[in-house]
A protein has these predicted regions:
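Short, conserved catalytic or adaptor-binding loops enriched in Gly and charged residues
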Residues: 8-11, 30-32, 105, 194-197
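General small-molecule cofactor/ligand-binding pocket signal
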Residues: 17-21, 40-42, 203
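A structural signal for isolated positions on well-ordered beta-strands in alpha/beta enzyme cores
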Residues: 17, 113, 170-172
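Active-site HxH/HxHxD metal-binding segment of metal-dependent hydrolases
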Residues: 1-23
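A short helix-to-beta-strand connector/capping loop
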Residues: 12-17, 34-35, 109-110, 198-201
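Binuclear metal-ion centers of metallo-dependent hydrolases, dominated by the metallo-beta-lactamase
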Residues: 21, 121-203
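Residues that form or immediately flank small-molecule/cofactor binding pockets and catalytic motifs
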Residues: 21-26, 44-46
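Active-site-proximal loop/helix segment associated with metal-binding centers of metalloenzymes
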Residues: 32-114, 118-127, 133-135
Length: 203
């Protein structure tokens, strides 16, 4: 990473923290976690080490009911931020307002998984279970499945099979071979249709 930044004369103005994928993937532990996100990864099936990464947003606070706050005579301002966080606040008139009474139910966070270079593998299916969006490589068309296995890349149908078996919300196929350009016998639209035949909610 340092070499790439140096060679490209890239300067970043924020702290960079490196997390090693291999130990977390092999042990099935969390790669990264903070107050908002959890990141996990798993090894894939490819000629060189490759990993899938899943990011889960933690549950979000319920929506703040501004109309209810106004009806209680709570003036807009910084106090709203505290109430949105569910804190109890003492107003200037002495009333104590419990912020949780002004917020709706907790909302689930969203989840995204990116599946880099791989042929179809069970590990990807397991990590992707129930994810909202699966971004999956789709290098080859189904007709070139033999080549996909040789090169350890996925076909459009393998990506769709992963999505279907994992019960994901939506599949986005990416990493298409440059051979599938408009005007060629097989185009990106053909790969999309192949995937949609197995998993309709594919883009």
């Amino acid at each position: 990473l340092k070499g790439a930044l140096h060679t490209s004369s890239t300067r970043i103005g924020y702290p960079l923290q490196v997390h090693r994928s291999r130990p977390a993937a092999e042990q099935g532990t969390v790669l990264f976690e903070d107050d908002e996100l959890t990141v996990r990864c798993t090894p894939l099936t490819h000629r060189v080490p490759a990993y899938a990464y899943r990011v889960d947003q933690k549950p979000l606070a319920g929506r703040f009911d501004i109309d209810k706050a106004r009806s209680l005579g709570i003036p807009p301002g910084p106090v709203y931020a505290r109430l949105k966080r569910g804190e109890s606040v003492t107003l200037e008139d002495g009333r104590v307002i419990d912020g949780t009474t002004l917020c709706g139910p907790e909302r689930p966070g969203v989840s995204v998984m990116i599946c880099t270079d791989t042929v179809f593998c069970d590990a990807a299916v397991e990590l992707a279970r129930g994810v909202d969006l699966l971004i999956h490589e789709s290098t080859f068309a189904h007709a070139e499945a033999e080549m996909a296995f040789q090169k350890q890349h996925s076909t459009s149908t393998m990506a769709a099979q992963t999505a279907a078996e994992a019960g994901v919300g939506q599949l986005a196929i990416t990493h298409l071979s440059p051979r599938y350009v408009p005007g060629n016998p097989v185009s990106p639209d053909d790969l999309l249709k192949e995937a949609q035949a197995i998993f309709p909610n594919t883009v």
